[in-house]
């Protein structure tokens, strides 16, 4: 009878429990080896695991994150690869500045967002991703009266930097990585995320009608606290 044996290089990093070996803080690399077992009492299979610590530089950094997260999210949610084309625009450099000192929002194909045109195709309650400040994926919010909200919501999860999709059915943002949840305004309602999603001001240019994002430095109206992202 043969068995599969895996040698642990760092046994102290393994966590054991009733359901077997597990540990959320490490990655397990399985390397099977074949051995011959003798004797009537040696029945069954014996398994150990080689554990490898996750390097610190692989933990998403809020200051260095890439908008590629958005592309990957689209790959999970769209039914065909051909439909991924619009998401390529989020890999271009951050949107151009405006005369007011903010950043002009860009849509999924890289065009500047014009408020009147946007509202023709986005219904009340809609939350759709655009490219915002520093190139971050940012939600434009359409109010019940068919106007744009004066705030926009940064889509980057405050836990480990995943892009958080909006769940229309539950009317909340739910992170696909570790289950963090935020209400429809981006306020955290369930961990492990420690903080609410960042905000940006959403203005409309008087002359050209383009949507402009401006850094939010005032009190967070959702929590009454100073903005952690400023």
Curated annotation (Swiss-Prot):
Transmembrane segments: 72-92
Gene Ontology CC entries for this record: chloroplast thylakoid membrane
InterPro entries associated with the record: Rieske_2Fe-2S, Rieske_2Fe-2S_sf, Rieske_Fe-S_prot, Rieske_Fe-S_prot_C
Recorded topology in the membrane: Single-pass membrane protein
Keywords: 2Fe-2S, Chloroplast, Disulfide bond, Electron transport, Iron, Iron-sulfur, Membrane, Metal-binding, Plastid, Thylakoid, Transit peptide, Translocase, Transmembrane, Transmembrane helix, Transport
EC number: 7.1.1.6
Location within or outside the cell: Plastid, Chloroplast thylakoid membrane
Family, as annotated: Belongs to the Rieske iron-sulfur protein family.
Cited function: Component of the cytochrome b6-f complex, which mediates electron transfer between photosystem II (PSII) and photosystem I (PSI), cyclic electron flow around PSI, and state transitions.
Designated name of the protein: Cytochrome b6-f complex iron-sulfur subunit, chloroplastic
Organism: Pisum sativum
Gene name in the database record: petC
